[in-house]
Amino acid sequence: MARIGESADLLKCSFCGKSQKQVRKLIAGPGVYICDECIELCNEIIEEELGEAAEADETVLPTPQEIFDHLESFVIGQEAAKRSLAVAVYNHYKRVRGPQARGGDLADRLTERDDLADVEVGKSNILMVGPTGSGKTYLAQTLARRLNVPFAVADATSLTEAGYVGEDVENILLKLIQAADYDVKKAEQGIIYIDEIDKISRKSENPSITRDVSGEGVQQALLKILEGTVASVPPQGGRKHPHQEFLQIDTSNVLFIVAGAFAGLDEIIGSRAGRKGIGFGAPLNHLGAGDVTYADVRPEDLLKFGLIPEFIGRLPVITTVEDLTHEQLVRVLTEPKNALLKQYQKMFLMDGVELEFEQDALDAVVAQAEARGTGARGLRSIMENVLKPVMFELPSRSDVGTVVISGDVVRGEAEPTLIPAEVERRRRGRSA
């Protein structure tokens, strides 16, 4: 048994040698003792080693099919966009992590090709074009969760050129660093999603002598970080000044996904695609409104919309999303893993109450979202308004077993049906 000096009653840790008076706790084993400080040190060592093992597992890159399947579990519709994103993201992280991302002997095979040794693969940032509420942001968030990389969302409308009132573009990078818990190395392999990118389009198609600090000026400021540069970021955000320290982050391996609704872009696409005749006698090929979709977009359309050529050139992957149909919006409510209806059913079950939505109610919720023109984004606020009175009352009652929502309830023409708990128990007993 571990002792100190002449004192038979003074015990010490068998690992660090500290006496029981020098530590808070001494735990006894068969002939040995360990103090609380050594236990804490052991836990840190174990966590560090497990963390390194987890990081090693994360280097195995999922295939485009696996990425697509993951998106399918959470996002309804937009199959073309999901396939395009899966391939683009796979190629990006394959470029970042190298051949070891796929395992096997690929690294050895690559070194055998002398003609490819000095080839540098360029970065492929992504531009997503589509109406509001169609799932652009959610697609990017789901991608980042699957790849387990830091993810930051920025709003392009708040950005201005350096020296003007508003946010510098470097503040976008600060959000990514914060999402990585200030681990710059981890942040350098993250994803930045910039929304409302169409709001920084050039105010005029022709260059102007007047300064456009929130439009073309922001596009110019974004060019370097999109392409890849070592940026200096103020750790607390805000404007730069010479007497502060900066965080240095290399954006060469940061994947940028920029997105916007691009209202009016369909008219630009239509004017290009719908008039193919040349000369006075040539027939004009008129297209109807339904014949033009975002999927027909080309770089020259974005140029005419107001994006500068250099900015478009740094976004080589262009993918489009379309308005969700009525049936797809109903599926958004019920089918994904984190479906809105499932979320509310879980919340109600925490109070011991089942929640049921009739098919007519789901259709009514979607009809209201379509009337507002907000797409899937408006579904939660409609559900919240419908269920708010019930959610206020239920925690105070213990006699309710099930709440049934009909279409009339959603339309404000009736009250929810409350089935007593006893009736619900008997009903479940018969079905069992």
Curated annotation (Swiss-Prot):
Subunit (UniProt): Component of the ClpX-ClpP complex. Forms a hexameric ring that, in the presence of ATP, binds to fourteen ClpP subunits assembled into a disk-like structure with a central cavity, resembling the structure of eukaryotic proteasomes.
- Which cellular component appears as one GO term in the record? HslUV protease complex
According to the lineage, what is the superkingdom? Bacteria
Tell me the ranges covered by the ClpX-type ZB domain, including all copies: 1-54
A Pfam family matched by this chain, by name?
A: zf-C4_ClpX
> Which residues are listed for ATP binding in this entry?
131-138
State the protein's name. ATP-dependent Clp protease ATP-binding subunit ClpX
* Main function: ATP-dependent specificity component of the Clp protease. It directs the protease to specific substrates. Can perform chaperone functions in the absence of ClpP.
One of the protein's GO biological processes: cell division
Family, as annotated: Belongs to the ClpX chaperone family.
